[in-house]
Amino acid sequence: MNRIALVFLYSLFLFNLAIGRVESQTCQCIQPDPSMLNCLGYDSKLQADTIDEAIASFPDLSLNDDVANQKFSTADVGCVTKECQDCRKDMRKQLQKVGLLAKDINDIVASQVDSNSTCTKYGFTRQQQKKSHDDDDDDDDSDSDESKEEEEKKKRDRKHRRDKRQAITQGSQNNTDPNLIGTRFTISCAMKGVSVDPTGTVSLCSSCWVWRQLPSNYRPQYINELVCDNTDSDCLSGYATCSVGHRTFEAIRNDNGVQTQVTLTAGSYCECRISKSSSLQSLVEGTGISGTYNPLSNHTTPV
């Protein structure tokens, strides 16, 4: 074999090796039977077989920020930067807070996210940093009493929704869907009307970023989901309702040693849908506004 051919083969080897490294960051594989060559591939951004894998690879689905997600998925594979390490530390604290990760007896880390964290990967870390910044501003602020009163009312409303959501989370999160396999843990939620998009557009529905832990006989064990906030299911001031959209995924179920590949569903997005009989239907169809507006008194089937 001549020298040119050897150089070509070596270059091809390096190329395939590089491609394999990139793919390994997003595609993992479960081998149900070690004696067989076939395996079940999965996207590590949406599924994980261990909690550490989920912490390392799950993006915040409540943030429509592809640039930030791409930055964290490729720029720091070894997690050597302070920002990456802060993100993992903040996520472990959050998982302990919601009950998905048990606190170690030797864990001396505070339960609250560090306000000095450099992590911008997650919505809850951004909120904590913003809250810390706002508190600092309040110390030097000379706004009127009326403005402060209005801001305090907003804070009380947000706290009420958060407390209500946490009560549901700490209780039985699956009551809203008795057919759901596994247990959902709410990581954070994004309120409707709050900008979560780099373009400045706002969402019509409040949504929650949740991690679902499947029963112990399922692999991969953890699912990354986005669902509607079940404490705030209305949109457009009650003229419409929020509905969750689903995606399907594959998993392996072990039934007393018998491995079975199964198809399950996961929450993928939350959208605002109007009732078919709503006066807003003409607005959706592009024919203008007709009729009077009667807010939904009950949740009819949306279109």
Swiss-Prot record:
Chain residue ranges for the region called Disordered: 124-179
Keywords assigned by UniProt, alphabetized: Glycoprotein, Signal
Ranges of biased composition (kind: Basic residues): 155-164
Polar residues: compositionally biased ranges: 167-178
Keyword set includes Glycoprotein: yes
Signal peptide (residue range): 1-24
Glycosylation sites: N116
Regions of compositional bias (Acidic residues) in chain numbering: 135-149
Superkingdom of origin: Eukaryota
PANTHER family referenced in this protein's UniProt entry, alphabetically: PROTEIN CBG09882, PROTEIN CBG18546
Protein name: Uncharacterized protein T16H12.9
Organism: Caenorhabditis elegans
